[in-house]
């Protein structure tokens, strides 16, 4: 059995899909856990997962590196990325090339709940310390995407979008 724990990223799910396809065996057992930041670390530490995928920034790196060391978990950087606004194609700002935080102020920022470890150091999104006028937290990616459409919400992310998994909306 091979298991991966990850924060809520479609690029990580896509990579998992590619691994399963590449194995090409008649029988196998895999597990994927899309979960909160602390749970990703716990799952790797307890060997529930062989691999964990997390977002590190200059802001949270020292705290998370300390946790990795305390939990005897090794961090390997996969890539670096910029920050992008993620919103649905029908959003009033969707046609803009660039969007400022001030322009986003009247729309709800959508973020992933981190449970008992709801420190901004555990946030999956960049700018977790910014004072948002409207903030909604959700537990899963499907709910976040529904809120994005239903409330013209947005989130801040890496910009790595997998259309074949997310769709084009």
Please report, for each region that a protein language model flagged, where it lies by residue:
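Secondary-structure junction motif
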Residues: 12-15, 61, 97, 101-130
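Short, well-ordered beta-strand segments
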Residues: 2-7, 52, 86, 110, ...
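Beta->alpha turn/N-cap motifs
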Residues: 36-37, 53-60, 88-89, 140, ...
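Flexible hinge/capping segments at coil-to-helix
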Residues: 67-109
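Hydrophobic hinge/microswitch elements
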Residues: 45-50, 114-169
């Amino acid at each position: 059995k091979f298991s991966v724990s990850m924060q809520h990223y479609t690029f990580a799910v896509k990579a998992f899909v590619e691994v399963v396809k590449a194995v090409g065996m008649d029988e196998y057992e895999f597990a994927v856990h899309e979960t909160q930041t602390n749970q990703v670390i716990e799952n790797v530490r307890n060997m529930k997962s062989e691999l964990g995928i997390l977002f590190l920034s200059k802001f949270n790196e020292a705290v998370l590196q300390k946790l990795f060391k305390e939990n005897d978990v090794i961090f390997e950087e996969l890539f670096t990325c910029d920050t992008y606004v993620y919103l649905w194609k029908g959003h009033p700002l969707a046609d803009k090339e660039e969007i400022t935080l001030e322009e986003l102020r009247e729309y709800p920022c959508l973020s992933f709940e981190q449970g008992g470890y709801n420190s901004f150091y555990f946030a999956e999104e960049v700018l977790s310390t910014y004072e948002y006028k409207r903030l909604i937290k959700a537990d899963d990616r499907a709910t976040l995407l529904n809120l994005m459409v239903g409330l013209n919400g947005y989130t801040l992310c890496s910009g790595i979008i997998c259309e074949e998994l997310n769709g084009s909306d």
